[in-house]
């Protein structure tokens, strides 16, 4: 603590127990002696949330044999799968 006080006696300069941001009466030394009081430090930027990467589903080998298969709508792909299950797809190709 400094001995050359400007207009205040040393009793009023003692730590009053208030946090530094609240107290205007006493002059805290820069490292605040009170635990848990407000200190002046640059604000930490908030972390941006990065969603986890979505795993890309690899097409089956039977999906690859038809090159245009991935350009069809989901319903058309479903119909083709159902026809393959019924073993009718090979008959329709002939």
UniProtKB/Swiss-Prot annotation:
Statement: the UniProt record of this protein carries the keyword Protease: no
Coarse class of the protein's main subcellular location: host cell
Inducing factors: Its expression is regulated by host RBM38, probably via RBM38-dependent splicing of the viral pre-mRNA.
Signal peptide: none
Keywords for this protein: Host cytoplasm, Host-virus interaction, Modulation of host cell apoptosis by virus
A GO CC term attached to the entry: host cell cytoplasm
Keyword Manganese appears in the UniProt entry: no
Protein origin, superkingdom: Viruses
Biological-process GO terms, alphabetical: symbiont-mediated perturbation of host apoptosis
Location within or outside the cell: Host cytoplasm
Assembly notes: Interacts with host GRB2; this interaction alters host cell environment by modulating host signaling pathways.
Function noted in UniProt: Enhances viral DNA replication and virion release. Mechansitically, optimizes viral DNA replication by interacting with host GRB2 to inhibit the negative effect of ERK signaling on B19 viral replication. Plays a role in viral infectivity. Induces apoptosis of primary erythroid progenitor cells.
The name this protein goes by in its record: Host-modulation protein 11K
